[in-house]
Amino acid sequence: MATRNSSSPKPMGTAQGDPGEAGTLPGPDAGIRDTSSATQLKMKPKKVRKIKALITDLGSQYCKCGYAGEPRPTYFISSTVGKRYSEAADSGDTRKETYVGHELLNMEAPLKLINPLKYGIVVDWDCIQSIWEYIFHTAMKILPEEHAVLVSDPPLSPTSNREKYAELLFETFGIPAMHVTSQSLLSIYSYGKTSGLVVESGHGVSHVVPISEGDVLPGLTSRADYAGGDLTNYLLQLLNEAGHKFTDDHLHIIEHIKKKCCYSALKPEEELSLCLEDLRVDYELPDGKLISIGQERFQCAEMLFKPTLVGSNQPGLPELTAACLNRCQEAGFKEEMAANVLLCGGCTMLDGFPERFQRELSLLCPGDSPAVAAAPERKTSVWTGGSILASLQAFQQLWVSKEEFEERGSAAIYSKC
């Protein structure tokens, strides 16, 4: 029997409004323009009245942050943290030890670059603390003790993650209230739905997560340890095989090439038969040099369908999804899931990917008529879902206050998150 995992309220209805309309929120509570009253805590109204909750989505590439009720994040902050090498510092050195966000562009000494997440899971909590300090004091310029915070939690993460987030935010930053909830649940809320199969592929990891009536089903969830970062590395490899000389120091350039020039071919075998002149595009490097990019434009995306191209024996994303659908059949959810396959995450933003994914999944599940949806703003689906959720009146009772955490410890987290 599939296990369920959810304590969040279930917003009903379909998405309304235009995500690009300033001050308008898509989703079940479309039209919310001022969340100053919507984010009051019923438990401790005197401490968090007239404030906006801070919504955060910490991903492998970027941390998205902004206020509840807004249609999109205020800031995208790099999840990479720079630490000075110990041998580069001495007792009289007054320069910074840790660099986050735009500080990495103005570093005063050689830095060791650290990504505190591996496959979406936090592995370095000291760096996470540095990112939070940057969010509160440099990016948002707010006093943390005046704002409730909603944090997203990736699928299949250790349950101890939620406790660690609570300890960090309550004890180090003194926030008045917080809530941690499933990344996939927030993604489905961004679609204005409570049931569906969430196919998430960001920078560091991909997941296929079934959700039924607002309940996450972790026992049926699938994970693949490849995503957008691997696609970027594969593009670098392909470009070098074509005669270019890029290194890991140029990954930011390769990332830009991927976003501007690359696409997912509906039928790659037909693309291979095209004249190279029809495929080639010129790309101007930062130094002004022009390079031509041909078949690499669509070849790089093939690793999402054939991970063996990058040395992985894991199934491609459509196969991973089809296998998850088959497990849902045993649990009695297959028809519901197949009718609502929802693409989320930055890696799915590649031109042509939704159409190719739909085609491959339909070939794998011919009798299920899978319906794939791809929202225009799906790159920030987790954050948008958090913005919706924290604005719902029904959600306000699920904030965990600092006083509750001090009195009950982790039990307060697990009873509401």
UniProtKB/Swiss-Prot annotation:
Keywords, A to Z, come to: Cytoplasm, Cytoskeleton, Phosphoprotein
Query: Principal localization?
Result: cytoplasm
Q: InterPro entries from the entry? A: Actin (IPR004000), ATPase_NBD (IPR043129)
Compartment(s) of residence: Cytoplasm, Cytoskeleton
Q: Tell me the domain of life.
A: Eukaryota
Residues spanning the signal sequence: none
**Residue intervals passing through the bilayer:** none
Q: Which PANTHER family match?
A: ACTIN
Instruction: Give the family from UniProt.
Output: Belongs to the actin family.
Q: What is this protein called?
A: Actin-like protein 7B
